[in-house]
Each structure stands twice: as structure tokens, then as C-alpha cells.
């Protein structure tokens, strides 16, 4: 009887590990395929360099802010949750930012490359891969925790991204705190998050006054928001493919290898390892959300943002592509190790 139970437990564990690998492949393959389509469109001159640049600007100033607004607004209920994992995530992202800031200063003298590398170190593809990943790892509980966490990590990612791209300016211009703060306030992505938070707060006030009202009640308006949201990611990926140059791989090999190792190896070890050692109260659902923060690839939105704010957009694009490929393994091994430690048992 005990042997049978042990065999069943091993089989169940193997099934989960297999599912993790399949999920990792299924999560990243649509991203890579869309990038390839963008690359093909460039080769047949349907997506020219000028058009790609114009679309990137449109994505950055319209589609991504609407997507972030919608992601925040869709959080159904904060309910009763432990703020510990939220505090941990935000502090860990800040520490990663600080450590990587020191690293890029010593690693390269090119301010544009510094900005792209620094942004790529901490900025996870949370909305596109992270939340579905949390659901795959720990079901409805995982996605509930990850959704709540998104209200805090997405603003954190974007604030630090603006700082990353503001402090390194070509020509050795010293960072101006006032300009950086103004850049944060004026940044379309930050404005999208802020608008989503305000709408969420208004909705909560309505609920407390027994007035049930949601944007979804205004069907035409919400349908437009949904359409614009759905355009953000595929357009970003198509443009990424159109701007991707294989010739740049050799030129940027040192930066690509360093960026991918940081994002796909060191950060998962740091973020998940410290949480496992010191945060004993975290359960499987919290760790599912943390995997989404620390083990996923670099956010696609980092490319249009790098282009619009004068960083090395070519390097940013290369980092997104190669970190996405590497994330197949980082996601798999993160879930495998956590499962073997009994976190996802």
C-alpha cells in the first residue's frame, strides 16, 4: 500500500515537472513565432524600418498604457491577502536594480547600452507570461495572488525603467532628479497604471456605497479598451522582429550573454532563493507569483520604451529575444527545484 502511494506521488511529481516544461515551451513559442513573422515581413518589405519605428511610438504612447490600465482595472478583489510577499517583491526588485546599476557602470562605458542592460535586468514579462505562469504552477490560487501582486510590481517595474533610461544619457549629462521625477510623471506607461489604479479605487468606492458599477457595464467603451489592449503585445513583437538583426548578435555578444545570464540565471536564484530561505510563511501560491516576477523573460515593452527614451533599442530587442529563448529553461528549472523542495507539492 505504501509503495503504491509512493509510486503515485512520484508519478504525480513527474507529471507536474513535465507540465512545467510543456508550459514553458507553450508560453514562449508564440512570442518567438510572432517575432519571426515580423522578421519575415521586414524581408518582404511589408514592414519597413520607418513604419516599425512609427508603430513602436504608437505602441508606447497608446496601446501599452491602455493595456496597463486594463490589467490593473481587471483585478477583481484584493480580498484578504498577506502583504508580506508584496513587500518582499518590491524590495527585491529595488535591490536587483541597485546591484545591476553598479554592474552596468563597470561593465560598459556606453550610456545607451548601460540603460538597455539595466532596464532588462529587473523588468519581467509579467503581464504576458507571468500571470498565466502562476496559474499553471498553482491554479486559481496562484493567479489570484499574481493578479494582486501585479498592482504593485507593474508600477515598480515601470518607475525603475524610467529611472534606468533617464540616468544614463549620451554625452555624460548628469542625471537631474527633477527631470527624472518629471519623466516618471509624464511617462505614458506610468500614466496608464495610475489611471487604472484611480479607476479601481472609484470602483471600490461604488461597491462600498452599494452601487455596482464597472467599466464593463459600458460595453462599447470597454470593448474599445479591450481591442486596444489586445493590439499592444502582437504589434510590439512584430516590430521587434522587423528590427531584429542577426548581424548585431556578434557585435553585442558580450552584452547579450551578460544580460541573459543576469535575467535568466542570477535573478531567479537571488529572488527565489532568498524567499525560500528567509520567508517561511510563503506558500505555493506566493511562490508561483514570485516565479512570475523573477524567472520570466525581459518585458517586450522594454524595446519601444528604450527607443522612445534614447537608449540602445537594438540591444534591448536582442535581450528580449534571447532571454525569451532562455526562459524556457529558467521557468522549467525554477518550477522543478521548487517542486523538489516541496513548495509545489
Model-predicted regions and their roles:
Residues 2-345:
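Alpha-helical transmembrane segments of multi-pass small-molecule/ion transporters
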Amino acid at each position: 500500500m505504501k509503495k503504491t502511494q509512493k509510486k503515485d506521488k512520484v508519478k504525480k511529481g513527474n507529471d507536474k515537472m513535465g507540465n512545467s516544461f510543456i508550459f514553458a515551451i507553450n508560453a514562449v513559442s508564440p512570442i518567438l513565432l510572432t517575432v519571426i513573422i515580423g522578421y519575415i515581413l521586414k524581408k518582404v518589405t511589408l514592414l519597413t524600418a520607418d513604419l516599425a519605428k512609427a508603430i513602436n511610438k504608437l505602441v508606447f504612447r497608446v496601446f501599452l498604457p491602455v493595456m496597463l490600465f486594463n490589467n490593473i482595472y481587471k483585478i477583481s478583489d484584493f480580498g484578504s491577502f498577506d502583504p508580506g510577499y508584496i513587500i518582499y517583491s518590491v524590495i527585491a526588485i529595488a535591490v536587483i536594480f541597485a546591484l545591476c546599476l553598479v554592474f552596468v557602470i563597470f561593465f560598459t562605458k556606453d550610456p545607451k547600452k548601460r540603460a538597455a542592460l539595466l532596464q532588462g535586468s529587473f523588468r519581467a514579462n509579467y503581464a504576458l507570461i507571468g500571470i498565466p505562469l502562476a496559474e499553471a504552477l498553482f491554479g486559481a490560487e496562484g493567479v489570484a495572488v499574481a493578479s494582486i501582486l501585479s498592482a504593485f510590481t507593474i508600477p515598480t517595474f515601470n518607475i525603475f525603467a524610467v529611472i534606468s533610461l533617464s540616468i544614463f544619457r549620451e554625452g555624460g549629462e548628469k542625471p537631474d532628479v527633477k527631470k527624472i521625477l518629471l519623466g516618471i510623471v509624464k511617462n505614458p506607461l506610468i500614466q496608464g497604471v495610475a489611471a487604472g489604479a484611480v479607476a479601481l479605487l472609484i470602483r471600490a468606492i461604488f461597491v462600498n456605497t452599494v452601487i455596482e458599477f464597472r467599466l464593463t457595464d459600458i460595453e462599447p467603451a470597454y470593448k474599445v479598451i479591450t481591442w486596444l489592449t489586445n493590439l499592444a503585445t502582437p504589434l510590439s513583437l512584430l516590430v521587434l522582429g522587423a528590427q531584429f538583426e542577426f548581424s548585431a548578435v556578434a557585435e553585442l555578444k558580450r552584452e547579450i550573454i551578460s544580460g541573459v545570464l543576469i535575467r535568466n540565471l542570477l535573478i531567479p536564484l537571488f529572488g527565489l532563493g532568498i524567499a525560500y530561505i528567509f520567508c517561511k510563511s510563503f506558500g505555493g501560491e506566493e511562490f508561483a507569483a514570485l516565479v512570475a516576477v523573477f524567472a520570466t523573460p525581459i518585458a517586450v515593452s522594454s524595446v519601444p520604451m528604450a527607443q522612445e527614451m534614447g537608449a540602445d533599442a537594438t540591444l534591448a530587442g536582442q535581450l528580449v529575444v534571447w532571454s525569451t529563448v532562455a526562459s524556457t529553461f529558467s521557468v522549467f528549472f525554477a518550477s522543478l527545484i521548487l517542486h523538489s523542495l516541496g513548495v509545489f507539492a
